[in-house]
Regions:
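ABC ATPase NBD coupling module
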Residues: 43-47, 101-118, 147-148
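Hydrophobic anchor residue at the start of the ABC signature
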Residues: 184
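Helix-to-loop junction immediately C-terminal to a conserved catalytic motif
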Residues: 84
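Signature (C-motif/LSGGQ) region and adjacent switch/coupling loops
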Residues: 105, 133, 146, 159, ...
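Short coil-to-helix segment of the ABC ATPase nucleotide-binding domain corresponding to the Q-loop/switch region
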Residues: 130-137
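Conserved ABC ATPase signature
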Residues: 170-174, 178-180
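Conserved ABC ATPase "signature" region
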Residues: 16, 33-42, 97-100, 141, ...
């Protein structure tokens, strides 16, 4: 269940997933249609398919936090990849602020990912030849910010993620948790 944080709740969910399925395999769509939404993982596995997400439905409103927990291989990352459209779901509906994510053009998806959502991967790719500050400023510069503005914003992010004093460190000089914070910043 999403948890309420101190913020006003809007009536429209920020994220809404309805009957979301992601099944990997050649016959996934056909099998899902034939199953009428009742997915038995063993039956799908016997047909050469792997069930990644099985009928996920939830809403997240402004100010809420959602924790997705499960065992290794249970589909947590697959669900998040579907929500960000890094992977297309086999079936279901995903709305972001009321907009149908599955109907968005590539241009709309790029805009959404740049301005409204992000994903921190388990294995993050920091540029090894750039410092903490440069790694944080780089995407801002790619997006069109001036060097001066991107450095200022990057310094603010360094403070926000608790890496003050490590701005000039290279990724190899940071712990795994510190590298993760650079990726988040």
């Amino acid at each position: 269940m999403p948890s309420q944080v101190d913020a006003p709740q809007s009536k429209q969910p920020v994220i809404q997933c309805n009957s979301l399925y992601k099944i990997f395999g050649e016959n996934a769509k056909r099998m899902l249609q034939n199953s009428k939404g009742v997915v038995d993982a063993k039956t799908f596995q016997d047909a050469g398919c792997v069930v990644g997400v099985n009928n996920a439905s939830f809403e997240v409103h402004q100010g809420e936090l959602l924790v997705i927990m499960g065992l290794s291989g249970s589909g947590k990352s697959t669900l998040l990849r579907c929500i960000s459209r890094l992977t297309d779901p086999t079936s279901g509906k995903i709305l972001i602020e009321g907009q149908d994510l599955l109907a968005m053009t590539n241009k709309q998806l790029i805009d959404l990912r740049r301005n409204k959502m992000g994903m921190v991967f388990q294995s993050f790719a920091l540029l090894p030849h750039k410092t903490v500050l440069e790694n944080i400023a780089f995407p801002l510069q790619v997006k069109g910010s001036s060097t001066q503005d991107s450095i200022k914003r990057a310094k603010d992010m360094v403070d926000l993620v608790g890496l003050d004093g490590r701005e000039n460190y290279f990724p190899r000089e940071l712990s795994g948790g510190q590298q993760q914070r650079v990726g988040i910043a």
